[in-house]
Amino acid sequence: MDRSNREHHSHRDHREHRDSKEPPTMAFHMKTWKTINKPLRAFAKLLRENTTVTFTPQPAIIIQSAKNHLVLKLIIHAECLYITDTDHFSTKTINNFVPLFDSFMGIISNPDVTKLYIQHDSDLYTRFLVTASDICAQASIPCVNGQEIVRESGKSALRIDLDHSTVTEILKWLAPVTKNKRSNKNEMTLAQIVVQVNPPSIKFLTDLNEIEFAHSGKVVFHDAKCMRLVLSSKNLQQAFSTCAVLKSSCSLRAIAGKEYKLFLIAKNVFLTVEAYLSQEQVKDDPKFERQAKTEEKGEKNHKVEEGNNFFCKQETQHKITSYMVPTKNGGTGTNFFNEKEDSESDDSAHFDYTPNSKRQRCGM
């Protein structure tokens, strides 16, 4: 064989080897996956509509859900994942809704799954390979572009750490407000958060009730500034419910911009949960305005001195976008595993409550 023929065969063999090479693949460490399966089932019910999934070469998986004045984000850390070729695995984003499987969250939270591969062999789509028992399925999911990952930006003017029991107490307190008006979905109930400095305390208020926490071993003030936040009570309940799934402490922060935005974060070794809440515009609500003025009078009596241990300068806050990606309207798609939804299962974020019209003060 002459030299030209040898070079031709060499190039052909190299091309065939390159074409047959497995594309960069992300997968779960199965032992870790089993450890986080139960919280993932709870997150699958909280993060459904208007949700995107981003795969990064760190590796990490970022699930982000956008609602009106609320963004919820779940990050699956590198301790749970591995990638066969980090140099050639590009960041990719898809919609949570996955034909044939119902949703990506439904796949990773299903205990029957024995293997899941996420492959990058095109910038236009993401390939899934899923096995469960004696079943094996493959699907190519189109990528979506222009989806912003919301991140905390700059220092916050407020940082308070709440232990898990305090988060549970807040959810029980919010339950009467968020559950008793389900019949009127268009009616929004508001919740106020009022922070005072001397002495440090945080108060949650609604039309029905209020609850207050002072500085203690369960509620630790690191930075504080007198402020009042006006939020949707339903958004606040969803944010705390998402953080409560991890059963760890939750950090509450307020980041300054044109107006303060509330930021909640809870984390463990494998998962991080973040919630970003924008304030609601209050109009034509005399009852709420009277209540707000009463609280503002209390705030004016507590001036923040320069050099105070609880003072923190204002920083610029990023813009929270509302991209609202298209999903299947309300219903459950064709599920590959034929798994029935059970909103009252042990994995649901459910809190019992006893209605109480009296004001509460919790000094721990």
Curated annotation (Swiss-Prot):
Residues 1-24, 284-306, 325-364 are annotated as: Disordered. GO terms for biological process: DNA replication; viral genome replication. Pfam families: Herpes_PAP. The gene is U27. This is DNA polymerase processivity factor. The keyword DNA-binding applies. GO terms for molecular function: DNA binding; DNA polymerase processivity factor activity. The keyword Protein biosynthesis does not apply. Belongs to the herpesviridae polymerase accessory protein family. Accessory subunit of the DNA polymerase that acts to increase the processivity of polymerization. It comes from Human herpesvirus 7 (strain JI). Keywords: DNA replication, DNA-binding. InterPro entries: DNA_clamp_sf, Herpes_PAP.
